[in-house]
Amino acid sequence: MRTLIGCTLLIALAAAGGGYAYWTEQREVGHYLSDLRVELAINDGVDSGRGNLLGIEAQLSPRDYQSLALLHLKLAAYMSKARDAGLLNDKTIVVLPEHIGTWLMFRGEKNELYQARDLSEAMHWLAISNPLTFTRAWLGAVGESRLNDAHLRMKAASMAADYQTLFGGLAKEFGVTLVAGSIALPDPRIENGTLRAGTGPLYNSSVVFDRNGAAQGKPQRQLLPTYEEQTYIQPSPDHQLNVIDTPAGRLGILVGSDSWYPENYRSLNEQQAQFIAVPAFVTGKDTWQKPWGGYKSVSTPSEISLKPGEVSEGAAWHRLTLISSVPTSTADAGITVFSQGKFWNKHSGGQSFISRNGLTSHDMPVTSARLLNLWL
């Protein structure tokens, strides 16, 4: 009798395990009508043949990341609108928002994930739908928040490949230089024009693709991650900023709040950066209008007199972004690009702006995805 009961239990466990394994392999793409609307919010200057900076403030949601085809559909629609408006040429530098690549961790998942009530539940579905991958990632995780590290690390190889395919493909398809926002990857590197993920700490990095779709230079790692991300995103160990030669001129990149630090502009000055792209990200509903929280990750730079709560988050971004503010920055112009949208219960809502002659453009009401163009 005991033998019979034991065999029955083993059969039941095997059946349950087999059923679970089969369930984890099922991936059905749900029906989703993507919002492809985009408006030209700013068109500053005139075409002098020297190129332009074009920021795409994308409206994004988890459903856009069900497949590369869906995300390509949306981003290609934005870029097609820019091309139809005469804003794309062989000297155009397109800039996308920070973390647009990080969300690729949700590509190709089960419908339960996209239907989750909040981000925490979505992460739960991500883990249980990929049990072996998640377990390996958790065992190799580093930093204070191993869970967040594991969630980002578990699909790093496929995320890097997807990022290369999507953004390198868009750069080639439209014949532009593309600053592909940023992506969180372990020890990213570029080999023969292709982005690869490593096995070390996680870095929030931006990659530039040329008109042939090849990744250029080195991934620009964020020097000073935000206070909220520091438990799993590591600061760049070499504190190095890279300047890349493009058909329009020499381009520097400051990821997110790296644009708040005067010493970073001086570093770009030394490398004769002519333009600066800032892929950026702000979380929280109405955060842009709420009081600025100050420098949380490090001490306030001695040159900065702005105090926490003195102005709104949006006003702080405008004041602390020092592009073309001589003598701190000798760059000719720049652009700061945020995303709009909602990932479950997490909102993103910064307002993109352009910088020229030490001045920034004014905020405007956001009703859809936006294009911001700055002729050089």
PLM feature spans:
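Active-site-proximal beta-strand elements of phosphoester/diester hydrolases
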Residues: 48-68, 219-221, 249-258, 277
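CN hydrolase (nitrilase-like) catalytic-core segments centered on the catalytic cysteine
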Residues: 165-176, 256-372
